[in-house]
């Protein structure tokens, strides 16, 4: 069966978007708020109609992730910040495979996300309450699967409990996107052998987005 590289690229962009948000938060203490909302919302939607629906039904919602994906797949730019993004992206993929192999962790994750739905009836998605709850899910369910993702950035920034909660929430969104990536036919071998197809697909999607003003 032919693989759907459109869906695979969207899901991979979701992983890369989460990685970019983690990087922005760790270095600056803040990030692209709209992109964060899209990524966090993807955690909540467990019964989407399509891959694109996971990310709010609009390709533009993944602009940051698609641009990051092109940087990660550009092998000539594996220095500095791009090396960080590549490490985060690959680490999220490794953790997702460990999650998939643990039925207990998957069941717990589903139950905890159902709890987020109840909290959303009373609190906003980016409220401290929800961010703390999502960070707690990452710490309790994902981190023990190991190996832990080493987040690098400004030590002063990373000491902030609010930044820590956002970083862990973004990592949870990255895991969600990595789960989706495998569901639609993604796999690690594509990063080696189908790199050009992924790059071309990402460029095609970006090309017909309206330019940012």
From Swiss-Prot:
It comes from the Bacteria. Keywords: Cell inner membrane, Cell membrane, Cytoplasm, Membrane. InterPro entries: HflD, HflD-like_sf. Its main location: cytoplasm. It is found in: Cytoplasm; Cell inner membrane. GO terms for cellular component: cytoplasm; plasma membrane. It holds the Pfam family DUF489. Belongs to the HflD family. NCBIfam families: PRK00218.1-1 (NF001245), PRK00218.1-2 (NF001246), PRK00218.1-4 (NF001248), PRK00218.1-5 (NF001249). This is High frequency lysogenization protein HflD homolog. It comes from Klebsiella pneumoniae subsp. pneumoniae (strain ATCC 700721 / MGH 78578).
């Amino acid at each position: 069966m032919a693989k759907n590289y459109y869906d695979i690229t969207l899901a991979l962009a979701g992983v890369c978007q989460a990685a970019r948000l983690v990087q922005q938060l760790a270095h600056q203490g803040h990030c692209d708020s709209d992109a964060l909302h899209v990524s966090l919302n993807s955690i909540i939607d467990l019964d989407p109609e399509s891959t694109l629906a996971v990310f709010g039904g609009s390709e533009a919602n993944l602009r940051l992730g698609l641009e990051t994906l092109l940087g990660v797949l550009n092998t000539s730019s594996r220095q500095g910040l791009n090396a960080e993004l590549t490490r985060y992206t690959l680490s999220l993929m490794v953790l997702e495979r460990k999650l998939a192999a643990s039925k207990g962790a998957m069941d717990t994750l589903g139950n905890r996300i159902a709890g987020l739905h109840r909290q959303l009836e009373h609190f906003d998605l980016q409220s401290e309450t929800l961010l703390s709850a999502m960070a707690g899910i990452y710490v309790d369910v994902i981190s023990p699967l190991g190996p832990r993702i080493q987040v690098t950035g400004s030590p002063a920034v990373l000491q902030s409990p609010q930044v820590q909660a956002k970083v862990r929430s973004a990592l949870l969104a990255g895991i969600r996107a990595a789960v989706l990536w495998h569901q639609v036919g993604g796999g690690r071998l594509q990063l080696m052998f189908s790199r050009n197809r992924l790059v071309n697909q990402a460029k095609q999607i970006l090309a017909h987005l309206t330019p940012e003003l």
